[in-house]
């Protein structure tokens, strides 16, 4: 008997069919990935398996968990043998911020395993240790807000294991994590699923490379239909559907391996370039001895407030027109440095100068000169764009506020055209756009004032691979056509390899490596750079025809 059987599943919401006759299964001891872009129907299919469909959903077909029919049965009303554990994409939302981690683990251990409070408390520590949390007895006495993203995600896996189910569903659990933390989370999932006494796994993702690291089988969805399924390595070797082929090609382009191999072949040439004196453009950013520390929460009512150094004294020079990637794991100091460059925070020591003029937080009027020269591309455009404003008003807003001379309507159209949004988008509202369209809008809004530099914070981390590839290509084209410099903060060396000529690696608040991207990938010198490279998922099987051009 399979852990999960989905047969001819159809789901319609508001009269629109979103899942159209999906059929697949997850056997005992299997890890199966459900692959597809946003809107493919994969997450809605997972919601049906979990019994979490919206109230207005109309369903047909069958879903059996351990032989029990569960389609249309809410999770709370399912029998014990048909329960499904869940690992959510956003661990910050999944965990209760007002309850300590210990209590959140103890509750399912008592409910689903019948343990006493004392035994459950001990089992909670053991679970925390098993998923690789440091100082497990101490860390579970914290609140979720006191943990890093990777630690929270491992707590979510521990919670799922505490439920003692035969099936676990993980919905994009590593999308928001840096590659090193992602690898650790995947290792935990690998260790504690698909065993004789551990649950089978249905893994939802858009990333073939991540899927290939974890799963044995794959179900590929597009527009609510299953277009291909089978053993994941067989699909890699000979994808039958054009859509599958495109997903694999995009995944290959998003890995760093082809760049590393090419640059290593050119290593002697790169070393010669390194030794040669290159002509240098004018300095745009001169970051001198900047540092920043923040107060930590007090331990107890009268406890001493400790300070945490987010950025040790750092020097960095960025020249006009450069494309620079600042990479590192969570907590490396890269976002703190970006905030200082954006004048959103003050330095404790040192200064940031732009074209010889010091930049520091002040009122909006005093920073107009700087906002004209530098614009920001956010990680999550949905959180920065007013959902009730039209596209036209959103792109026009910085032109008006910064007093940019000229015909603003023409400038708006030019900016939208540059990012591939035609005039039909002018009167749409921000909440009517897809994730990729919203990111293009954020870029259009940033380039409308014709800045000298764009500062981008993880600009593609939340996007599907094909959309991620198109946004990176767009940023590169804008830089080449307009001479616009770009500083992009990311944990993803593969994205930086595709966009940036120079890469700065940060760790624990310090710059540990700063070289041309080609040289850094071909011959990484620092252990943290090597760790970032090693953590990037690799497609183990790949058709020669899909090799990307470099």
Predicted regions and their residues:
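Helix-to-loop junction immediately C-terminal to a conserved catalytic motif
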Residues: 50, 342
């Amino acid at each position: 008997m399979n852990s999960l059987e989905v047969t001819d599943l159809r789901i319609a919401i508001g009269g629109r069919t979103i899942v159209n006759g999906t059929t697949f299964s997850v056997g005992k001891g299997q890890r199966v990935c459900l692959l597809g872009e946003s809107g493919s129907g994969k997450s809605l299919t997972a919601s049906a398996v979990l019994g979490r469909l919206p109230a207005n959903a109309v369903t047909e077909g069958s879903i059996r968990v351990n032989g029990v029919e569960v389609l249309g049965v809410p999770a709370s009303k399912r029998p014990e043998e048909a329960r499904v554990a869940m690992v959510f994409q956003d661990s910050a939302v999944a965990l209760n911020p007002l309850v300590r981690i210990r209590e959140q683990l103890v509750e399912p251990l008592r409910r689903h395993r019948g343990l006493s409070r004392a035994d459950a408390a001990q089992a909670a520590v053991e679970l925390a240790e098993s998923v690789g949390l440091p100082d497990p007895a101490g860390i579970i006495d914290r609140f979720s807000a006191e943990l890093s993203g990777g630690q929270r995600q491992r707590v979510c896996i521990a919670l799922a294991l505490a439920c003692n189910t035969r099936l676990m569903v993980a919905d994009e659990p590593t999308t928001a994590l840096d590659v090193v933390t992602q690898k650790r989370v995947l290792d935990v999932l690998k260790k504690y699923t698909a065993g004789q006494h551990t649950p089978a796994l249905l893994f939802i993702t858009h990333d073939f490379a991540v899927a290939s690291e974890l799963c044995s089988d794959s179900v590929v969805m597009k527009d609510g239909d299953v277009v291909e399924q089978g053993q994941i390595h067989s699909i890699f070797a000979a994808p039958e559907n054009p859509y599958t082929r495109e997903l694999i090609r995009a995944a290959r382009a998003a890995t760093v391996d082809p760049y590393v191999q090419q640059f290593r072949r050119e290593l002697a040439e790169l070393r010669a370039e390194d030794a040669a004196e290159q002509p240098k453009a004018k300095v745009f950013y001169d970051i001198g001895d900047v540092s920043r520390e923040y107060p930590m929460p007090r331990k107890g009512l009268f406890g001493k407030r400790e300070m945490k150094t987010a950025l040790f004294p750092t020097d960095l020079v960025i020249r006009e027109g450069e494309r620079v990637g600042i990479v590192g794991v969570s907590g490396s100091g890269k976002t703190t440095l970006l905030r200082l460059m954006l004048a959103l925070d003050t330095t404790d020591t040192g200064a940031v100068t732009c074209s010889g003029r010091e930049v520091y937080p002040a009122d909006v009027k005093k920073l107009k000169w700087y906002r004209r020269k530098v614009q920001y591309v956010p990680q999550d455009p949905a959180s920065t764009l007013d959902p009730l404003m039209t596209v036209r008003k959103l792109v026009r807003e910085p032109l008006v506020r910064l007093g940019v001379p000229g015909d603003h309507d023409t400038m708006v159209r030019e900016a939208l055209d540059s990012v591939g949004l035609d005039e039909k988008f002018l009167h749409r509202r921000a909440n009517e756009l897809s994730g990729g369209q919203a990111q293009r809008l954020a870029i259009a809004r940033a380039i409308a004032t014709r800045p000298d530099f764009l500062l981008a914070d993880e600009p593609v981390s939340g996007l599907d691979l094909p959309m991620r590839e198109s946004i990176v290509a767009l940023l590169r084209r804008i830089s080449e056509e307009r001479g616009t410099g770009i500083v992009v903060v990311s944990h993803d060396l593969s994205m930086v390899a595709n966009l940036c000529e120079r890469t700065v690696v940060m760790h624990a608040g310090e710059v540990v490596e700063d070289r041309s991207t080609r040289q850094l990938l071909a011959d990484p010198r620092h252990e943290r750079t090597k760790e970032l490279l090693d953590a990037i998922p690799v497609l183990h099987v790949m058709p020669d025809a899909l090799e990307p051009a470099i």
